[in-house]
A protein has these predicted regions:
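Structural motif
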Residues: 34, 47-49, 92, 102
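Conserved catalytic cores of phosphodiester-cleaving nucleases, focusing on short active-site segments
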Residues: 37-59, 75
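Acidic-basic catalytic patches of nuclease active cores, encompassing PD-(D/E)XK
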Residues: 1-28
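Active-site metal-binding core of divalent-cation-utilizing nuclease and nuclease-like domains
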Residues: 20, 24-47
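Domain-level recognition of nuclease-like catalytic cores that cleave nucleotide substrates
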Residues: 85-109
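Basic, glycine-rich
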Residues: 6, 21, 31, 100-105, ...
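Mg2+/Mn2+-dependent nuclease catalytic core
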Residues: 56-76, 85
Length: 109
């Protein structure tokens, strides 16, 4: 499966999970020229910025290892822009990394 399709699948799974738990998904793939935030969701008075990492194998490393500090900093700066542009600076903010390791599913049955 292509990396882009794998990533899209993980993001869709994440959005479905969030919606089932009464989150409002505000954005998917919000970006500027320096960074991208996979999912931005709102629940109550908290805005959640979510990086989704999906893997089909461990060849490229585990999904949880794929968000270096430099990327975290770019996401944080883009989140600040998003909050200001959308008049959400009064909201609480949380950052999350959702990891989906699809290769584990192969061995579930």
């Amino acid at each position: 499966m292509e990396n882009k399709k794998i990533g899209s699948l993980g993001e869709e799974m994440t959005c479905s999970y969030l919606k089932d738990r009464k989150f409002v998904v505000l954005e998917q793939n919000y970006r500027n020229r320096y960074a991208e935030i996979d999912v931005i969701a709102l629940k109550g008075d908290t805005v959640h910025f979510i990086e989704v990492k999906t893997r089909c194998s461990e060849v490229a490393g585990r999904a949880s290892e794929a968000v270096p500090v430099s990327k975290q900093n770019r996401i944080r700066r883009l989140a600040e822009i998003y909050l200001a542009d959308n008049d959400l600076c009064d909201k609480h903010v949380e950052f999350h990394v959702v990891t989906i390791d699809l290769h584990d599913i192969n061995y579930a049955f």
